[in-house]
Amino acid sequence: MALALLSLLNGLSYGLLLFLLSAGLTVVFSLMGVLNFAHASFYMLGAYAGYALAEPLGFGPALVLAPLLVGLAGALFEHAVLRRVHPMGHVPELLVTFGLSIVLLELVQLVWGRAPVDFRAPQALRGAAFTLLEQADGGLTAVAGAAAAADCAAAARCHPFPANRLFMGATSLLALAGLWLMLARTRLGLVIRAAQTHPQMVRALGHDLGRVFLLVFGTGTALAALAGVIGGSTFVTEPSMAASVGTMVFVVVVVGGVGSLGGAFVASMLIGLLQTFAVGFDQPLLQGLPGVPPALARWSLAQLAPVLPYLVLVLMLVLRPQGLFGRPSP
């Protein structure tokens, strides 16, 4: 029971981080029709910017300033480069953003090197947020923070939940709530939603679509950078983090339905829970079946966890190519 609860919380926190990262890409595509190939590179850039700012200023200011600076850089890129390429079609946009991803990767390696940097959350987030004490009779007791050694010794099992995981989920949730409020409750959000379906009408009413595109692209890159600060301090900050998380983001976007924010949320939760439960309940898949070679009989769910999102992607492309909430092509 405790293991299932911890796997659920880990899956939700990881899923919220994935959604925070994929939400920016989804909003940019739904409004501008741009599939930003460099989106994960802004995630990496946010992690390194947070690392650089955390040393002199502290983690809290870095958590705020790094997304703002990266979002400003994304807005400048949209204004100076992407806006000129946008009328040429999707292929030039993909090539330009792909080139940007290479430039950002080389820039990060030039400044910070290829090895991981020591970017960690503050001391307050390095311990346990709470501890689940599982009794021999199956009962559960939750203790705030790290449980005392005597309490762990008296319990059948002791399961701490990391504070940085709780912070990751809570911060992602707050940022996404702010994004929802902006899109659903403000005049700017009304203009953005109207521009998704009726851009010519929005322009005819006197709104500057170029300024809307600038703001949306900057917001999308800022969300990616915020996810980078959180994810980089929780997992690892290294140049390859963009490549490792970038494929996962595109899996989320395609499974949820390209351009669908609700679909990206459901897909993020699905993939986060699928991976964490596979690792948490590590069981041999083929053990005991007749005729199975010993090498295959040792395969476990944890070994297949990195592959499971891509299996979901393949099944989705076969059974429902438009994704969970996407619209079928006419």
Tell where the protein language model's regions lie, with residue ranges:
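Alpha-helical transmembrane segments within multi-pass membrane transporters and channels
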Residues: 58-101, 107, 266-271, 275, ...
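Transmembrane helix-bundle core of multi-pass membrane transporters
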Residues: 84-85, 93-185, 212, 277-306, ...
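Inter-helical junctions in multi-pass inner-membrane proteins, predominant
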Residues: 2-17, 182-187, 213-259, 276-285, ...
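Hydrophobic alpha-helical transmembrane segments of polytopic membrane proteins
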Residues: 20, 70-72, 247-272, 309-319, ...
